[in-house]
Amino acid sequence: MAFTAMTVAPSALADLVLAQKSGCTVCHSVEAAIVGPAYKDVAAKYRGDAAAQDRLVAKVMAGGVGNWGQVPMPPNAHVPAADIKALVTWILGL
């Protein structure tokens, strides 16, 4: 069995740590859907959508249901707005 080294950019690692600290990774991961969609699926769905950043920041703050099935995403009032914006920017860049 061979192992390969994985290089992760420091900013990407910092954003993943922020997602963990904010509680996002309870329901989401980068590669695979858990309760909510995978971050890479979110990035693919909104690629090229100029309004996605603002819309997703509002959705993460307020929560909601219906964009990815019927499992609701709770509001995230405990997460600072600047952190939500940073997370959405990171996710859309995947």
From Swiss-Prot:
PROSITE patterns: CYTC
Modification(s) after translation: Binds 1 heme c group covalently per subunit.
SUPFAM superfamilies reported for this sequence: Cytochrome c (SSF46626)
Coiled-coil ranges (or none): none
Keyword Endoplasmic reticulum on entry: no
Pfam families for this protein: Cytochrom_C (PF00034)
Residues given in the record as heme c binding sites: C24, C27, H28, M73
An annotated Gene Ontology molecular function: electron transfer activity
Keywords of the record: Electron transport, Heme, Iron, Metal-binding, Signal, Transport
InterPro entries, per the entry: Cyt_c-like_dom, Cyt_c-like_dom_sf, Cyt_c_ID
Signal peptide range: 1-14
Gene3D superfamilies: Cytochrome c-like domain (1.10.760.10)
Function noted in UniProt: Efficiently couple electron transfer between the cytochrome bc1 complex and the photosynthetic reaction center.
This protein's name: Cytochrome c-551
Source species of the chain: Allochromatium vinosum (strain ATCC 17899 / DSM 180 / NBRC 103801 / NCIMB 10441 / D) (Chromatium vinosum)
